[in-house]
Amino acid sequence: MGASASTNEQIIENRILNEAYNSCPSVGTANVTTLSGIKFEAPANCNPPSAFVIGQTATVDSNCLLTSLQKGAASAASKLSSQSKAGLGISVSTNISEVENSIANITNNTCAGLATNNVVDITDTVIKACQFRVVQNASSKVSCQINNTQNLISKIAADATSQAKGGSLFGDLFGGGLGGIIAAIIIIVIIAVIIGAVVYFIKQSSKNKGAEKIIENPETAALLVGGFKSFIGGASDFVDGLKKTNMYKFIVLLIMVLIIVILLKTLDIPNPINHPNDSNRIY
């Protein structure tokens, strides 16, 4: 489950980033461009595979990229639950424009102390798209906003994956919403009935030597013993076998542990998956 969730998260993140980078037209570059120390973090699961290609088409304007990243982040974030959006510090509105403004305000405030007039070296901007791009004309503040928006997109992708999965083992087993809760309750009741039946017949068999003495009332005996025998093919043999091997203790313990795990997992709150460069992420 973990590997699958990680893959799905990366696919969502790649889609948002690639659409943002590809939505901006190419811009001209200077005659000489220094690429020493460039930060190109090619993600996994790129389709087509990631590539580092230098040319006139490998450039993108920083302001266009920032706007596109914020739009992509807003589009994905608007589909998250109110709880997830609140956890990210994003407006809980379902209106994409309001969510986009909220994301812009977050990154703007995070990078508030940086200059808006000096153009930074391209090495200050991290490229996370599958295809390499040279980000042109970025001020210190815009570069900071681009990096922080990309990190925010990573968190949005993690929450989107967790939300789709149900957010916990409970969601994976039973699905989300009311239907999942009802299914869990039904399964727990069935397990409880099985445990009760096993415990009852074990206690009764320990008090009596033969199956015919399990209960003295003939009608009740016929109902309980006969019905149980038809269900498992011989209650006394089944119970005797369990008692001799102590297997019933293991079965009861295993079922109880399963119930406890399921109940605990229903209280799990989806947490964003940790990513590299957590120090640059928005909290």
Swiss-Prot record:
Q: Which GO terms describe its cellular component?
A: membrane
Identify the keywords attached in UniProt to this record, alphabetized: Glycoprotein, Lipoprotein, Membrane, Myristate, Transmembrane, Transmembrane helix
Q: Cellular location of this protein?
A: Membrane
The lineage's top-level taxon is Viruses
Which residues are glycosylated according to the annotation?
A: 31, 95, 105, 108, 137, 147, 277
Enumerate the transmembrane spans: 181-201, 250-270
Primary residence: membrane
Lipid-modified sites (N-myristoyl glycine): 2
Regarding the membrane, this protein is recorded as: Multi-pass membrane protein
> What name is this protein filed under?
Uncharacterized protein L323
